[in-house]
A protein has these predicted regions:
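Residue-identity detector for threonine
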Residues: 8-11, 20-21, 44, 50, ...
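A short, highly charged, low-complexity intrinsically disordered segment
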Residues: 13-17, 218-224
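Short linear motifs in intrinsically disordered/low-complexity regions
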Residues: 6, 32-36, 208
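Divalent metal-dependent catalytic cores for phosphoryl transfer on phosphate-bearing substrates
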Residues: 68-74, 80, 102-222
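Short acidic DE-rich linear segments
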Residues: 2-4, 223-224
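Acidic/His-rich, divalent-metal-binding segments that scaffold phosphate/diphosphate chemistry
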Residues: 22-139
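Acidic, proline-/serine-/threonine-rich low-complexity intrinsically disordered repeat tracts
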Residues: 3-29
Length: 224
């Protein structure tokens, strides 16, 4: 009888563990990336998120390219990349933290992953990327977009934090993860060294995996 009870308890514990092992996947084949992006951010219930999402749509984030001629240099590339980063940030987070601990910090992972490149949509009614037209008058096939010469070259991670905090509050960990998501490849490398955090590393690793492996990018254009 005792063995039967012990087996029952183990079965119940296994069932409970399965329920908390992993959150719902960030994306499934065929899902609309706009819906994934909106739904994930709204589920955080962060105050001001509805206004931020309205702003994100108005500013052109959903249609913006992710780079000039590197990974996902196409219309909608920035949205696609952001959803990819969330997908792999969740996988990394669950693998390293475990399902139960990950669920406690999931909101921060979602916010940092989906907003880390928010600044790439531009600012002051100016897009960060514009069409790259050659001297011949034809658009470049190798590098379809270029940095907008009319927009000052504020690092996009800095701009991401600025735009997000117009509408929502970010935690210190979230700000640091967004600011340093490029890791030692970007302008913050001296300040970051030795001050990495769990969230910053998860977002950095997910960003690298998405951009370099899944999306086929390289470092030929640096972080942007």
């Amino acid at each position: 009888m005792a063995k039967k009870d012990e087996k029952t308890v183990q079965t119940q514990e296994q069932a409970q563990a399965a329920e908390t092992t992993a959150p719902a996947p960030a994306a499934k084949k065929g899902d609309n990336p706009v819906d994934i992006f909106r739904d994930a951010l709204m589920k955080t219930k962060r105050e001001g998120m509805t206004d931020l999402l309205d702003f994100i749509q108005d500013i052109g984030f959903l249609d913006a390219p992710c780079s000039g001629g590197n990974h996902l240099a196409k219309k909608g590339g920035l949205l696609e990349h952001s959803v990819n980063v969330l997908k792999y940030a969740e996988k990394i987070g669950v693998a390293l933290l475990g399902g139960a601990e990950y669920n406690k910090v999931q909101d921060s992972v979602v916010i940092a992953a989906l907003l880390h490149d928010l600044g790439k949509c531009g600012d002051y009614d100016k897009p960060m990327y514009v069409d790259n037209i050659l001297k011949s008058g034809k658009p470049s096939e190798a590098k379809p977009f270029k940095r907008n010469p009319d927009l000052l070259a504020v690092p996009h991670a800095v701009r991401s934090i600025k735009l997000a905090t117009l509408f929502i509050d970010l935690t210190e960990d979230e700000e640091w993860a967004i600011l340093c998501h490029a890791g030692l490849y970007d302008f913050m490398y001296k300040d970051l060294k030795g001050k990495e955090t769990w969230l910053q590393l998860i977002i950095h690793w997910a960003d690298m995996w998405a951009s370099r492996i899944i999306e086929g990018g390289s470092d030929k254009e640096g972080a942007e």
